[in-house]
């Protein structure tokens, strides 16, 4: 029996039927969120029983979706809370991984902006290392990313995915030693 991660979203009315079914089939609920009249269950269920759970949840107006990141904690690291660093791309990335089942936390650095003063303090480093993976969201400027990244990765023991404005090829060229993943063309762009 192979367990796969799924998310159930539906009304709170009679959601216990779905919870009991999941447990009876040999699966388990990782997290349960009750939001007003809606419930969200992140769970692991047997692969061969997903269609049965979908059939049972249909009359309850529930939907079952694949969620490959259930049980994963991801730190989305932003350079500051300022308007040019945090709100748009950081929130988009955090919401995207949340929809795939991950638990995302925003970490904004006290000394992130500026090439000269950029750095992590011990508390920030410890918080980032508590996660399964860290997504660093840096800016649009190659020189800034190249200069800051060695300082910002010092002491980080979890895999790092680097997001920035330059293309993937440019990010791979300017980061040494390499990080675990790159996502280019992410940031604030003129429209």
Locations of regions flagged by a protein language model:
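Short amphipathic alpha-helix segments
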Residues: 9-30, 52-53
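Short beta-strand-to-loop capping motifs
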Residues: 6-10, 41-49
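Conserved short beta-strand edge segments in small beta-sheet-based binding/regulatory domains
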Residues: 28-34, 55-76
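Conserved mixed alpha/beta catalytic, RNA-binding, or beta-rich assembly cores of soluble enzyme
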Residues: 86-191
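Generic non-transmembrane alpha-helical segments
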Residues: 17-25, 56, 60, 96, ...
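Short, surface-exposed ligand-recognition loops at beta-strand->loop->(often short) alpha-helix junctions
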Residues: 4-14, 81-86
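Surface-exposed aromatic
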Residues: 36-40
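Short, low-order "capping/linker" segments at domain edges
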Residues: 48, 72-94
């Amino acid at each position: 029996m192979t367990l796969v991660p799924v998310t159930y979203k539906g009304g709170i009315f009679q959601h216990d039927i779905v919870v009991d079914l999941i447990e009876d089939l040999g699966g388990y609920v990782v997290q349960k969120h009750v939001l007003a009249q809606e419930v969200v269950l992140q769970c692991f269920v047997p692969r061969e029983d997903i269609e049965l759970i979908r059939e049972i949840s249909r009359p309850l107006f529930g939907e079952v979706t694949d969620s490959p990141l259930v049980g994963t904690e991801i730190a989305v690291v932003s350079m500051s809370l300022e308007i040019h660093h945090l709100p748009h791309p950081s929130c988009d990335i955090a919401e995207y991984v949340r929809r795939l089942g991950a638990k995302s936390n925003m970490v904004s650095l006290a000394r992130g902006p500026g090439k000269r003063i950029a750095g992590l303090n011990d508390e920030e480093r410890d918080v980032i290392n508590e996660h399964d993976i860290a997504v660093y969201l840096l800016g649009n400027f190659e020189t800034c990313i190249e200069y800051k990244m060695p300082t910002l990765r010092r002491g980080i023991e979890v895999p790092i995915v680097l997001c920035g404005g330059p293309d993937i090829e440019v990010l791979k060229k300017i980061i040494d030693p390499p990080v675990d993943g790159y996502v280019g063309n992410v940031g604030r762009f003129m429209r």
